Amino acid sequence: MAYSIANNQLLRQNFAKIKKIIDIPNLIDIQKNSYKRFLQIDTPPEARKNSGLEAVFKSVFPIKDFSDTASLEYVSYSLGTPKYDVEECHQRGMTFAAPMKVKVRLVVWDVNKDTGVRSIRDIKEQEVYFGEIPLMTENGTFIINGTERVIVSQLHRSPGVFYDHDKGKTHSSGKVLYSARVIPYRGSWLDFEFDHKDILYVRIDRRRKMPATVLLKALGNSAEELLNFYYRSEEIGLDGERMWKKADAELLTTQKTSSDIVDSKTGEVIIKANRKFTKAAIRKMTEHGITEIPIKAEEVCGKYASTDIVDPATGEVLVECNEEISQAKLDEIKARGISEFKVLFIDNLHVTSSLRDTLLVDKINTTDDALIEIYRRLRPGDPPTLKSAQALFDNLFFNAERYDLSAVGRLKLNYKLGLGVPLDCQVLTKEDILEVVRYLIDLKNGRGTIDDIDHLGNRRVRAVGELLENQYRIGLVRMERAIKERMSLQEVENLMPHDLINSKPVSAVVKEFFGSSQLSQFMDQTNPLSEVTHKRRLSALGPGGLTRERAGFEVRDVHPTHYGRVCPIETPEGPNIGLIASLSTYARINEHGFVETPYRIVSEGKVTAEVKFFSALEEEGHAIAQANAEMDADGRFVNDYVSARKSGEFLLVHRDELELMDVAPMQLVSVAASLIPFLENDDANRALMGSNMQRQAVPLLKADSPLVGTGMERVVAKDSGVSVVARHTGVVESVDASRIVVKIDEDEYDETGTGVDIYNLIKFARSNQNTCINQRPVVKVGDHVKRGDVIADGPSTDMGELALGQNVVVAFMPWGGYNFEDSILISEKLTKDDRYTSIHIEEFECVARDTKLGKEEITSDIPNLGEETLKDLDESGIIRIGAEVKPGDIMVGKITPKGETQLSPEEKLLRAIFGEKAGDVRDTSLRVPPGVEGTVIGAKVFSRKGNDKDSRTEMIERMEEEKLRKDEQDEIRIIRDSAVGKLKRLLVGKTAAVKVEDKNGKTVIAKDAAITEEALTAIPLDRWDEISVSGGEGVEEKVAAILATLQQQIDIIKYVFDDKVQKLKRGDDLPPGVIKMVKVYIAIKRKLQVGDKMAGRHGNKGVVSRILPEEDMPYMEDGRPVEIVLNPLGVPSRMNVGQILETHLGWAAKGIGWKIEEMLEKHSPSATIKEYLQKVYGSKEMNAFLDSLNEEELINVAKRLQRGVPMASPVFEGASEEQIRSMLDKAGFDETAQVRLFDGKTGEPFKHKVTVGVMYVLKLHHLVDDKIHARSIGPYSLVTQQPLGGKAQFGGQRLGEMEVWAMEAYGAAYALQEFLTVKSDDVAGRTRMYEAIVKGKHTLEPGLPESFNVLIKELQSLCLDVELLEGDED
């Protein structure tokens, strides 16, 4: 068994106690799936779902003109191929986008003026170009104007209905006022709210409030219908003086008896007077058949009639609906002989009179009046007509064009109110509004619950696809207006669809979204982890979201529903804390935009293998066990009572009541947090810093994967897309630093493919953060790779695992005060070995433009410069690759024509003699800015189409063409070899039916002779189809088919090659006015130095304070010096003990490595090495793997482990203290992991033993080189004439008011005068100073500071006549 990389992952000693149930979903699927659903690019037009782009087109089209005689209908859309590929877009500063065409149909109608019947006159169909739409790259990013960007998903409030109360803060009485709000996806908001008098009001779009019954009446309800909808009625019967009410079990439960209730047959008293109607009492009544309950007259007085009470004889209305029944009215009812009537059941305890009170306040009686009242509120000042009022009201909530609840909104509305409206009804219905009010009244009456806005069932994620869909809709609506206007202005029958459609507004909106939206962000490309995290980020900010200032504490806080969905740890420190979050490791987003997390299904106390995803609403009410709950071999819970979560609480639940179980302990944290070993032993604040700082780790020159990891490193490296992953299974044909060629196994490739995979690696490219992206092969020729194997490492990856820092030997002890306040003392060995050296790449651009005075020119012929300055430029004026540059050096020579100046007679003479070229240009070359020192690693030249190419451009083109040609030849060679192999297997050994001659007429294969390999080799491949075989069924056909396929594949390869070469030689699209553009790339090597920021993974950060010679570092008894000394005081108060456990486990890992190294040095027998390794790993699969290796392979494995045995301690189920002790023991160390150290300077042992171990330490992107800055002379501000500030402007240090006081306190008068005048804003003094320095005098003549003039001018601008009187002192 060849030792391949695939085995590398087995070599991590994993301490996980829980078996992996499901794989972590691809980490960037959230981006890719969303955009896929939006574009539906691989789905044929007729099969596309009504979602994404398709839904936008369908919702805006058809567009009709104002007179309804023509309509423009949408048929389908199609996407072309992008003009440039990803790499070219990067280089040329282009957008990676595909052209879009939309097929539309223009239908023109004829309308018969007499009958009004419409008939089709004309139908025209046409494909119209619809601008470009950016495409997503393989890695879930977009390339916009040459830079890689990420669209961050937005977490916003879900559409639907929300109930809330003011917690008693609105009114002084402290009364709790309830409110309801219907939020659509787009359209008007609808708010219902109670005031302190219990009257229900409504607001439309947050306008002035009006009684809610106005809205309900506008829906077509009368006051009587409303009362009977919201209130139950009681039937009252009259017979002479006797009065009774019908027994209604539901209403009786809240009432008392007024007199004894007697069974009329037996005379038995069933319920005594003044007793409550209990359930038992009501049951007893029913058994005795009692349906009427006697009541007294005073019980009816004060009730309200639920319908008009009418005299049957005369038709006169005695009591109107909603009118209070008084004793007089009751007497009249009796007198008129009315035997029964209905009253509303309102007891003001369980049923309040708020809706009835609202009807009394509301002075509007009819639907028409209600509509006009609403119109007046929304459009004050407009004279209302019934028609316009009705149209306005219908458009508000019932018109799909103006109002859209979306499927999610409808789902939430149905869920909350228990409705059964179909999901495709996405406007409000009459029933919706009535039910919203009913639920609100119930809330007031003490039934139902208010909503928690921070619950993840009420917040949903808008990913890329949906955000872009909304932008597209905005663009199309703008376009729709223009189309309607064009239709009405011109004769439609003479137009084609393309005359009507102008796609500019749509393109503009999309461009603006990608270029400047708050959610379209410059990708954080510092290292692979920062890329993955950026794509998995959720932001509550952005258009339609919250703002930093308005977001309160609740929104930012961790919520129980975040468990397994949103990480409680990873969020920025500062004003955005809690508003920007990260998806948890296993979380995904469902079709409605809710975040889901997987759980194992538990049935009858047994955990099944089934895994299902649940959203926050779906998991509500389920009892969920934790992933580490103890189970036996059958998957049954060991303990009777298990710790579980239910409705946001942690409870002890009986095992039979459990329904779900977490899939993994790391389910609740994000990717970055899951990379921190022993996270469970860290304080949350420090873990937050740790997960954030890992994203700032700079990729180092020598990547080194962590000895103590968590097992997530491989997943992150693979999903981030920085390493190269094999597309098919096959054998490595050739490998060099910049490409890998893999011949695909025959059973893998399809007929359309070529059978060859060529992987061109990225070499020393620049990332968005100027770090270096470089890929290195990890396979050898002849290796067999499987689909999905890592074949080349990218930045910060080591053998396919994420490697952000270095494993270093640390000691926790003070050392001469150099680790005061978190400072870090490091050994010079780390800088010598380039352990923390990183490469940074800067890009510089020089543009030659066509100016008013003439064309700028890129050339090496620059006036007034010596040979020495120009020695590294080639004849085109561009610096050669490999040149070492320092600040001020010229990278690209450029001259610009000067304006015409008055020439002196001498200059005129010189011009006459030497021609005009001498003095009319100035040097505007591109120079290296201050603080940059490095090596030129590349230059690219872009010139306008039709311009002559210079020699440098031609050379670059030649090199590129060579590369392409090499790829083409390799592909052809491999597929030809593969075809020849197939043909030989078919033909060799068969009998020839005809003789075959070579081109000289010599017989190579005789008739009836056996065909041999040598004979075949002598015939050119294209003549093999002449060979005929006797008795071989279908062999000739197979040969012909293989040769035809081969030719076809070769043609495809050649076509692709020619196309690429043609693209290469074509001129470039440059911005207007630009003739030529040159980009120069400089690689800067940054060694670790004093002032650089470093950090561990546990939020333990510090700044390098001193680099100590190796011999001065504290050393162990065997003479090994430590590499870093940290302050032990940094641990206890910060409570990030995880770093100590990591140090101990790392020490054990390192010690085991040293033991293996010792064995190898002593040439111990392989059996001894194997036995030791099996003792270290102690797992069955590892032992079996080690047994399967031969001696050479075992030695190779051992050599790999010399630097230390990698361990994985997954979060929340990591190594226990016993396991760490056992590992230390196997490494031959003391259990305390403390060592006697000796002072490197004196050789004396330190007084106490010191904790020593191996920690994984990162170098962060805050490098001192980028921050340190000094200025002697530089630019000044235009108005104040003071030096600018900041490194970017090459500014000075600010000397403020307090610094002036300090100078005054020391009495440093002359120094202070200098600071405030010539070094700041004294223009005349500066000039005199310059003269004095040139003449060698060292005197100071300060003048008047410019700020004084500014002050005078400001006072004059206030119309104060201020002037400075200058004169002699007397």
Curated annotation (Swiss-Prot):
Q: Which NCBIfam families does this UniProt record tie to the protein?
A: PRK00405.1, rpoB
Q: Note the Gene3D superfamilies from the entry.
A: 2.40.50.100, 2.40.50.150, 3.90.1100.10, DNA-directed RNA polymerase, beta subunit, external 1 domain, DNA-directed RNA polymerase, subunit 2, domain 6, RNA polymerase alpha subunit dimerisation domain, RNA polymerase Rpb2, domain 2
Molecular function per GO = DNA binding; DNA-directed RNA polymerase activity; ribonucleoside binding
* Alphabetical list of Pfam families matching this protein: RNA_pol_Rpb2_1 (PF04563), RNA_pol_Rpb2_2 (PF04561), RNA_pol_Rpb2_3 (PF04565), RNA_pol_Rpb2_45 (PF10385), RNA_pol_Rpb2_6 (PF00562), RNA_pol_Rpb2_7 (PF04560)
Outline what the protein does. Answer: DNA-dependent RNA polymerase catalyzes the transcription of DNA into RNA using the four ribonucleoside triphosphates as substrates.
Its lineage opens with: Bacteria, Pseudomonadati, Thermodesulfobacteriota, Desulfuromonadia, Geobacterales
The protein in question is named DNA-directed RNA polymerase subunit beta
Its Enzyme Commission number(s) read 2.7.7.6
Q: Does the keyword Transcription apply?
A: yes
Any one cellular-component term (Gene Ontology): DNA-directed RNA polymerase complex
Assembly description:
The RNAP catalytic core consists of 2 alpha, 1 beta, 1 beta' and 1 omega subunit. When a sigma factor is associated with the core the holoenzyme is formed, which can initiate transcription.
Family recorded in the similarity comment: Belongs to the RNA polymerase beta chain family.
BP-aspect Gene Ontology terms:
DNA-templated transcription
Q: Gene for this protein?
A: rpoB
**Which PROSITE patterns does this chain map to?**
RNA_POL_BETA (PS01166)
| Organism of provenance | Geobacter metallireducens (strain ATCC 53774 / DSM 7210 / GS-15)
Key words, A-Z: DNA-directed RNA polymerase, Nucleotidyltransferase, Transcription, Transferase
